[in-house]
Amino acid sequence: MERLYYLNHAPIDFHFAQTPRDFVVEEIPLYPFSGAGEHLVLKIRKRNLSTFELVDILSSHLGIKSREIGYAGLKDKSALTLQHLSIPAKFGDKLEAFDHPEVKILEQVRHENKIRIGHLKGNRFFIRLKKLSPLNSLKIQGVLEEIKRWGIPNYFGYQRFGNDGNNHEIGRKIAHGEQRVTSPKRRTFLLSAYQSKLFNEWLKERIKLSKILAEFTPSEASRLAPMIPVEQLKALQKQPHPFKILPGEILHHYPHGKIFVAEDMEEESRRFVEKDIVPAGLLSGTKAKSSEGIAHLYEAPFIDEKIQEQGSRRLAWIFPEDLEYRYIEEEAHGELNFYLPKGSYATVLIEELAHREIKID
């Protein structure tokens, strides 16, 4: 997908190689583990392995089925990652003989429950940018200040769409009955990619609208956004945040909490700037709460009623936390540390920073 960036700076030149040395991810658990129970939680460091491959390695060694192993989220293959997996505690003794060149078990602790998908708070990242000139490093510092203030769009990253970038196309064919996939897990995975594609296209369209409101007078903007009355365009332009909240928008308490429909636009826009709430985009499917009014007019083109998977809402905007940057001039390297809520992609932040698509080695 050709992404639309919300910031307006020129592209910044640097090299990013997604390798275990230059890309480190640490999962932050949703809650502390209790120290007692029938499950054994393993804190594992892996490199050059996907989470699925890690699960297969562990299940083979332990002699158990893959579905008996729990994990909170999928971690990148081309990275050094730290994440938690759970196994039935009765198989813990077999770990004494476990040895793998790309996997190290750092900690073990008992817990009452199996780890489930989504049971994480977020992820902490370390990223190294290479071939970075002093001038471009200064540009990065300026852009990072904007990101600290306003946040970034919560696009799904390229990883969501598979190695060939076409998982969403297969998902659309499944939804429309044009292709069959026998594996329920694979089917859900591909349909999820299609939902993600629709979300990204909606978010791109909304950023386009926000840019129109920033760059044109209300009368000029009305020709480019004819679904919105001129008086409403004027009100939207007064919102302080670059991403404009529309009447009838579904909003989400940030980063966790309930969703609700925007009503008091002045109050909601203030809370958005204060990082208390954010717009929530649609993952098209059944049982998802619908937006209303003008917001629904912009959402409707990205709803596919053929999708029978359950729909939901996803944060459309996120605020990176603990964002730190340092430049090592003698090596022409920049080093970034930051935290993102679960489900968000570090590569999306890097592309917003670079203002261009990042070529992944």
Swiss-Prot record:
Belongs to the pseudouridine synthase TruD family. It catalyses: uridine(13) in tRNA = pseudouridine(13) in tRNA. HAMAP family: TruD. Gene3D superfamilies: TruD, catalytic domain. One of its GO terms (molecular function) is tRNA pseudouridine(13) synthase activity. Its EC number is 5.4.99.27. Responsible for synthesis of pseudouridine from uracil-13 in transfer RNAs. It is an enzyme of class 5 (isomerase). Residues 151-318 form the TRUD domain. Keywords: Isomerase, tRNA processing. It comes from Wolinella succinogenes (strain ATCC 29543 / DSM 1740 / CCUG 13145 / JCM 31913 / LMG 7466 / NCTC 11488 / FDC 602W) (Vibrio succinogenes). GO terms for biological process: tRNA pseudouridine synthesis. Transmembrane segments: none annotated. PANTHER family: TRNA PSEUDOURIDINE SYNTHASE D. This is tRNA pseudouridine synthase D.
